[in-house]
Amino acid sequence: MPSCGRVLTPAIFSVVLLVAGPAQGQAYPTKPIRFVSMGLAGGGTDYAARLIAPELTRALGQTVVVDNRAGEVVPADTVAKSAPDGYTLLMNGSSLLFLPLMRTNVPYDVVKSFAPITLAHQSPTVLAVHPQFPAKSVSELIAIARAKPGELDFGSAGTGSSTHLAAQLFKIMANINVVHVPFKGSSASLTALMGNHVKYMFCTPGSVTPLVASGRLRALAVTTLKPSALFPALPTVAASGLPGYEMVSTNGVLAPAGTPAAIINTLNREIVQILQKKQIRDAFFNAGSEVIGSSPEEFSRTIKSELAKWGKIIKDAGIKAD
C-alpha cells in the first residue's frame, strides 16, 4: 500500500505554494534593518533618517538601525551593492542625484541601481545678501548684476553643492555675468557672506533662518516654485521676475534595485504613515523641510525629471565636482 504524505501530486504542490507564498511575504521583516544615511553625522540627511528610524522600528516590529556613512559615494554604493531583500535602505541626500552628473567614476546608476520607496521631504534654498548690500529684492539684485557685469560674486558651500546649483540656475535664467566663489562647507560660505566678502548666496533653510532673524543677513526670496509655508513672508524667485525658477533638494528612501514589490509597498505604506504624524512633520518643518510622502512611482518620476533638468545645467556650465 503506498505511503501517504510522502509524495505531493502537482495539484497538491500548487496549493502548498499558494498558501506558503503569501505567508513568506507577510513575514517581512524577520531581522533588523540597516538604514544608511548620506552625509555628515548630524547633518540634514542623517537627521531625517533618525527621525524615521524609531517610528519604523515600532511599525515593523524589528529594529531599524541608522548607519551613517561619511562621504557622498560610499553610502549610496553600499546600498546599491547590498542584497535586494529589504534589509538595507538608503536615506539619500541631494548628492545622490547631482554627483553622477559631475563625475565620471561614480560606481552606481541612480535610476538602475535603486528602487525608490518614497520621496520623504524637500528643502528649498533661500537667496540672501549682506544687510549693507543695496538690493532689497530679486529684481534689484538682477539690475545691479547687469549694470556691473563680472563684478558681483556669490558664495556657495562648494562646487556642485545645492547652493551652487541654485545660483547657477539663477545666473542662467537672469542672464547675468557673476563670479562663483566656492567655500568648503556652509559654515565658511556663510561667514564670508556675513563679512560682506561675497555679495549674495543661496543658503540652506536651517543655516540661514537664525542669521536672518538676528539681522546679520537679509533674505530676498525662497526657491520653491509656489509660496513656501517655511518662509511665508518671502516671495519666490519665480514670482520675482524669473518665472519657472525652482530649486529644492529631493530627499527620500530607497532600496537596492530588484527589491520585491511587496517589500517596497510595505515600506512605502509604513513610512508615508510615519511622515503624516504631526510630531514628525513639525520636526522636519523646524529643520527647514516640508514633508512629502509620495508613492514609489512618483518618487521615480521625480528622480528622472531632476536628473534631466540638472544634467543639462551641469553639462552646459561644465561643472565638475570637487
Question: Language-model segments: which ranges?
Answer:
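An extracytoplasmic/periplasmic, membrane-proximal ligand-sensing/linker region
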Residues: 30-32, 172-176, 261-322
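N-terminal (or domain-start) structured segment
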Residues: 25-112, 151, 159, 175-202, ...
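A ligand-binding cleft/hinge motif common to bilobed small-molecule-binding domains
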Residues: 96-105, 171-173, 200-234
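Hinge/capping helix and adjacent helix->loop/strand transition within the periplasmic-binding protein
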Residues: 81-87, 101-188, 237-239, 248-283
